[in-house]
Amino acid sequence: MSRTNFDTLLEAGCHFGHLKRKWNPSMAPYIFMERNGIHIIDLHKTVAKVDEAADALKQIAKSGKKVLFVATKKQAKQVVAEKAASVNMPYVIERWPGGMLTNFPTIRKAVKKMATIDKLTNDGTYSNLSKREVLQISRQRAKLEKNLGSIADLTRLPSALFVIDVLKENIAVREANRLGIPVFAIVDTNSDPSNVDFVIPANDDATKSVEVILDACCGAIAEGLEERKAEKVDMEAAGENAPKGAGKKKNTKARMDKAEEEAINAAKAAAFLKEDEEA
């Protein structure tokens, strides 16, 4: 059964492309006709491509991997944030940080810095700092949250990218191509689909168009996550019924002395302040 249909896509305006003079010839296979100087996308092909992409996304989610959603254009930001968050997937809607994929370890350091600042807040280290120092660290935390907060749970490279408007997000697409990360994308008639692995030909400028396609794709991701959860429950049940081992592993992790931990936290706070002054 198809995850969407012609009428739903038509009502959402998914068929409206760009002006003929702005078209990319590589999108010719997905164009149905021209009307009043505007290209009309073949929605029958869009339905098929949505199903194809959704099936692949379901398998990625079922395997426990992450899909990174990218949409920095105004019309798509809010809906992408809502849909991606609903299936616990990371997303970028503010500005694509250069090297987000190709220099991922550096991005992870910035994300870890947020966690460290949160720890300083919770363990009382802030009480030993001046108001000015607290303000500096808080501003640094807010800046990191704005740009990287939505990818805080991304501990490794994503297994796929889902892009809204490959023309605008060309840097993200190039980075994914360079690393061999599959790219799923809503591609309008003015864009080049050649660097996209799963092309969904549709209007990428209308919020409603983006929303109906994300509904289908995120619905598939949700199914994959549910199936993974069910498989885990079955495996745990099977493990409980199996013969238990003789001994249990002991937790040998050493605990840090409180005074030493406070000293380290104070040093980290000082490091944040130094970075802020140098910046």
UniProtKB/Swiss-Prot annotation:
One Pfam family this sequence matches: Ribosomal_S2
Any GO MF annotation of the entry: structural constituent of ribosome
One GO-annotated biological process of the protein: translation
Keywords: Ribonucleoprotein, Ribosomal protein
GO CC aspect terms: cytosolic small ribosomal subunit
Stretches the record annotates as Disordered: 232-260
InterPro entries per UniProt: Ribosomal_uS2 (IPR001865), Ribosomal_uS2_bac/mit/plastid (IPR005706), Ribosomal_uS2_CS (IPR018130), Ribosomal_uS2_flav_dom_sf (IPR023591)
Highest taxon of source: Bacteria
Family designation: Belongs to the universal ribosomal protein uS2 family.
Name the record gives this protein: Small ribosomal subunit protein uS2
Organism per entry: Phocaeicola vulgatus (strain ATCC 8482 / DSM 1447 / JCM 5826 / CCUG 4940 / NBRC 14291 / NCTC 11154)
